[in-house]
Swiss-Prot record:
One of its GO terms (cellular component) is cytoplasm. The active site is at D12, D131. It holds the Pfam family His_biosynth. Pathway: Amino-acid biosynthesis; L-histidine biosynthesis; L-histidine from 5-phospho-alpha-D-ribose 1-diphosphate: step 5/9. This is Imidazole glycerol phosphate synthase subunit HisF. It catalyses: 5-[(5-phospho-1-deoxy-D-ribulos-1-ylimino)methylamino]-1-(5-phospho-beta-D-ribosyl)imidazole-4-carboxamide + L-glutamine = D-erythro-1-(imidazol-4-yl)glycerol 3-phosphate + 5-amino-1-(5-phospho-beta-D-ribosyl)imidazole-4-carboxamide + L-glutamate + H(+). It is found in: Cytoplasm. Its EC number is 4.3.2.10.
Amino acid sequence: MSLAKRIIPCLDINGGRVVKGVNFIGLQDAGDPVEIARRYNDEGADEIVLLDITASYEQRGIMIEVVKNIAKEVFIPFSVGGGIRSLEDMSALLNAGCDKISINSAAIRNPQLIDESAKRFGSQCIVVAVDVKKVSQNSWNVYINGGRVDSGKDMLEWINEACARGAGEILLTSIDTDGTKGGYDKAMIEAVKSINVPIIASGGAGSMEDFADVFVHGADAALAASVFHYKEIEIKMLKTYLQDKGVPVRI
């Protein structure tokens, strides 16, 4: 049997609370991260991603506390990203109880950070998050600083470099489809099919069909936020739907 496809809810955290906005604008409080993470754990999520979207230094201590509290309540793997700039940041979060670290802008600015972190903590702990915008028919550029700045790097070149340096997984977000609920960018996922580490697709989930589609196009895992937060899609029902469609999932 092929490896089970993973369903991963994402929690955007701001000042210790889960928030949700469209394209980072108009943030609404969506609840307590520990309660929401526990709910996803109970509903059958395979993993959880926590994204510290403020990620300023004064908030860092709050995030450590959130991670400690979630680690006590949640028994599925969870990763933490947002504003992680050093091995010390990673060490503090892993010691607080998370399983994986997600790095994004810091990895573009200092690619050596991927090598160093993979060497110290193991590739299985290191997720490189890549936010992209389409620039032509089959070409995407990598954006940093919360999707605001074009790094000038080509998606495929950067993902290949990140994997060569030791990334254990790629979290690939289409900025174009993010928050639209019109489906994942399937051409983007198709373009990275040959990459030999797991690819988590992100940006655009609006229906159960969208999940089935992105798995057919080669994603190893699918991440979503608002459709799960607001219970538009229940994870148990989604997994039953996927199983009926012949997608291997862990029930």
